[in-house]
Amino acid sequence: MALDLAEYDRLARLGVAQFWDGRSSALENDEERSQGGERSGVLGGRNMDGFLAMIEGIVRKNGLPDAEVCIKGRPNLTLPGYYRPTKLWDVLVFDGKKLVAAVELKSHVGPSFGNNFNNRAEEAIGTAHDLATAIREGILGDQLPPFTGWLILVEDCEKSKRAVRDSSPHFPVFPDFKGASYLTRYEVLCRKLILKGFTPRPQSLLRPALRVLGATIASFRKPRVCAHLRHGWPAMYPVGQSRIRVNF
């Protein structure tokens, strides 16, 4: 059975459009309440919901039409961790009692990129390491490894594309970070989050990352396939004034 990417291109563009529409509405409401600034646009909670249809479409089209796709309700989106008791995810996919996929959806819009990038990086690294360790320690029981993903939408603007210098007087910064813009830093972050044994493609796209999700779904559809899917392709998908980077 060939993988079906479920119109990912169109759905990704709709997701970006919905993000900016939702953010603009939040800012307008904020101004009406005279609370000022960027806060509502940043904290508008469900601005990334437009990408849920893309993820759910991949699940439904690749062998698990009756899978439970959890997107709401704190108890439904909570998984145990190894270094902390629990972690709240944005999307969880189950086939019966088996965890098929866990995905985080994030965004980063200016004007501040410096500290916020570090916060996003620390969050992504911690989340990936925590869940991977819990899985190795057997928290999910006897099942195939689930698909795990971290998708971030970054504003494509002058500040995010500007070269940034770092000062590290005691030891040198890794070459791939020297003079790198924040957009490039996100790409480097995603590449380095890839599980050992995979080499990033020279031109990373959203499509190959979603193919990994589809392949994982298909592996659950065929229980006799016991290959350990150690996967992770980063993806960058330029759409209008945004760029989507995905690490799976």
UniProtKB/Swiss-Prot annotation:
GO terms for biological process: DNA restriction-modification system. Its EC number is 3.1.21.4. It catalyses: Endonucleolytic cleavage of DNA to give specific double-stranded fragments with terminal 5'-phosphates. One of its GO terms (molecular function) is DNA binding. Keywords: Endonuclease, Hydrolase, Nuclease, Restriction system. Disulfide bonds: none annotated. Belongs to the XhoI type II restriction endonuclease family. This is Type II restriction enzyme XhoI. The lineage of its organism: Bacteria, Pseudomonadati, Pseudomonadota, Gammaproteobacteria, Lysobacterales.
